Amino acid sequence: VLSSADKNNVKACWGKIGSHAGEYGAEALERTFCSFPTTKTYFPHFDLSHGSAQVQTHGQKVADALTKAVAHINNLPNALSDLSDLHAYKLRVDPVNFKFLSHCLLVTLACHHPEEFTPAVHASLDKFFSAVSTVLTSKYR
């Protein structure tokens, strides 16, 4: 459960990301594909090379979804319902992949914002990404 401090930390951190959200989303995807090669199986039609336009575009989609989640942090299930349906019923993504991407998002954000990435912010973002992952996998049951 996200506390008020967690929500404030997430909103403050995401606010500092600003226009770099898509770039960081793509970087996190690249990290995920490199660190967890089985995740590539969901993107057989993508050019997964460094800096590819397809990875950049999908990274922006990830960032947009997270930006929406931050904006609706008090009602994640409603805000992410369509995305949950897509991943559960159409794409059938293995739920563990959300944990992999979450980890890579944390690494990416820590690399780009080391001063702001305090232990408290790290914990808050980890809880937030976990909450988002839980919502995205909630319709698998």
Curated annotation (Swiss-Prot):
- GO BP of this protein: hydrogen peroxide catabolic process
User: N6-acetyllysine-modified residues are where?
Assistant: K16
Positions carrying N6-succinyllysine: K7, K11, K16, K40
Q: Where in the body, by tissue, does this protein show up?
A: Red blood cells.
A single Gene Ontology CC term: hemoglobin complex
The residue stretches assigned to a coiled coil in this entry are none
Highest taxon, organism lineage: Eukaryota
Modified residues annotated as Phosphothreonine in this record: T108, T134, T137
- Subunit structure, as described in the record: Heterotetramer of two alpha chains and two beta chains.
Explain the purpose of this protein.
Answer: Involved in oxygen transport from the lung to the various peripheral tissues.
This protein's name: Hemoglobin subunit alpha
Q: Which organism is it from?
A: Panthera tigris sumatrae
Q: What is the lineage of its organism?
A: Eukaryota, Metazoa, Chordata, Craniata, Vertebrata
